[in-house]
């Protein structure tokens, strides 16, 4: 007999947003839920992100690729899955420019596998789907393209206009989910979120990259003129939004999730420098070299989108979600986490990361 608790299948749960989501869910629901985490453990997936929960009886880790249909079918066959929360994706724009085919394989084909397996497991013989099942596809605001400086926002009705191989692959996966909802009446939602920051983020991304380099006295690479604008959201606020959409979102709807926090990249870098200097004791030798002199402008990213800005009106009005963490607080919490987890950073920045870093950040 099935236990009276919801079972969540989380894909990519060893990555940055996925692991934060799992931690959030266990903090909120404790033993009232069960989570199965399937992750291929590629370079950005780190089992250390989930050390605190790995011994829980209601947590199971499965090392598998979402493109492996047999492995995913086995999970559905052996478990009564109530929710799929689909994070698993290749997500770094720079890497997509070098190896776009990897992004198409994981983000588009992998999503098709997940959709097919969930559909097969949840379909009823006489049509329709089992009650209280839902597939939540986690996506990005980058599918909407680029906005002009100082004007306009992305809404759920904004036409898709992806400009990088990464955003094109995510747009493709979004369209697959939309097609399943339209064709099969498949129980799903899509969330499109702005840039996240917080604990466990792999240091190829801007904020952990700048924190890590500044503490080591290394150059702080800034693309182009540094004036590209992003909307930043603390990752725990994103985890809460996903949970609320799962429980309160209307089926077949898309919800934009944003932080109401637009900042230029160069602003972010300068805020991190100032916050590090404020937080480091005067006796800490690292404090002396954490200055704006480390800022180094590098060749701009190919096709670099100028501005992203999300309008989260719909999720606020329908579900009651709003970002709770102000950027000043969130960046301090993020820096505190990296201070407390220096060994984690050392482990993830060894080996292949150093080679990648040298390839990506050449001086102008």
Feature roles, as predicted:
Residues 1-196, 246, 275, 333, ...:
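N-terminal Rossmann-like NAD(P)+-binding domain of SDR-like oxidoreductases, especially those catalyzing
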Residues 12, 167-168, 201, 232, ...:
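Residue-level marker of alpha-helix boundaries and capping positions
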Residues 20, 48, 74, 95-98, ...:
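Generic recognition of short, well-ordered alpha-helical segments
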Residues 20-24, 28-29, 35, 64-67, ...:
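C-terminal substrate-binding subdomain of Rossmann-fold SDR/epimerase-dehydratase oxidoreductases
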Residues 53, 150, 203-211:
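A glycine/serine/threonine-rich, flexible loop-to-helix segment
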Residues 71, 102, 109, 202-206, ...:
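Residue-level recognition of oxygen-bearing side chains
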Residues 80, 164, 186, 199, ...:
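A general, composition-driven signal for non-globular sequence regions
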Residues 111, 174, 206-207, 308-309:
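Generic non-transmembrane alpha-helix signal with a bias for helix starts/N-cap capping motifs
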């Amino acid at each position: 007999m099935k236990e009276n608790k919801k079972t969540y299948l989380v894909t990519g749960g060893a990555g940055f947003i996925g692991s934060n989501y799992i931690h959030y869910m266990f903090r909120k629901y404790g033993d009232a839920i069960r989570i199965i985490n399937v992750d291929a453990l590629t370079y950005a997936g780190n089992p250390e992100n989930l050390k605190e929960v790995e011994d829980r009886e209601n947590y199971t880790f499965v090392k598998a690729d979402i493109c492996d249909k047999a492995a995913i079918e086995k999970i559905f066959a052996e478990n009564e899955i109530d929710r799929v929360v689909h994070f698993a994706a290749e997500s770094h724009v720079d890497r997509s420019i070098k190896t776009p085919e990897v992004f198409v394989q994981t983000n588009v084909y992998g999503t098709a596998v997940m959709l097919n397996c969930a559909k097969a497991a949840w379909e009823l013989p006489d049509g329709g789907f089992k009650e209280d099942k839902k597939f939540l596809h986690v996506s990005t605001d980058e599918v909407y393209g680029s906005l002009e400086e100082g004007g306009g926002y992305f809404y759920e009705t904004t036409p898709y206009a992806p400009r990088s191989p990464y955003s094109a692959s995510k747009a493709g996966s979004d369209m697959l989910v939309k097609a399943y909802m339209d064709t099969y009446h498949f129980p799903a939602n899509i969330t499109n979120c702005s840039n996240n920051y917080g604990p466990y983020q792999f240091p190829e991304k801007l904020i952990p990259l700048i924190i890590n380099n500044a503490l080591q006295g290394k150059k702080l690479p800034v693309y182009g003129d540094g004036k590209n604008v992003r909307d930043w959201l603390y990752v725990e606020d994103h985890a809460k939004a996903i949970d609320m959409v799962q429980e309160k979102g209307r089926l077949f709807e898309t919800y934009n999730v944003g932080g109401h926090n637009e900042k230029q990249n160069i602003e972010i870098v300068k805020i991190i420098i100032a916050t590090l200097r404020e937080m480091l004791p005067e006796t800490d030798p690292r404090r002396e070299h954490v200055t704006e002199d480390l800022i180094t402008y590098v060749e701009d990213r190919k096709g670099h989108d100028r501005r992203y800005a999300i309008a989260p009106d719909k999720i606020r009005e329908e579900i009651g979600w709003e970002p709770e963490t102000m950027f000043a607080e969130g960046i301090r919490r993020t820096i505190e986490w990296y201070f407390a987890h220096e060994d984690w950073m050392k482990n993830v920045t060894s080996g292949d990361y150093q080679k990648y870093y040298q390839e990506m950040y050449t001086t102008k």
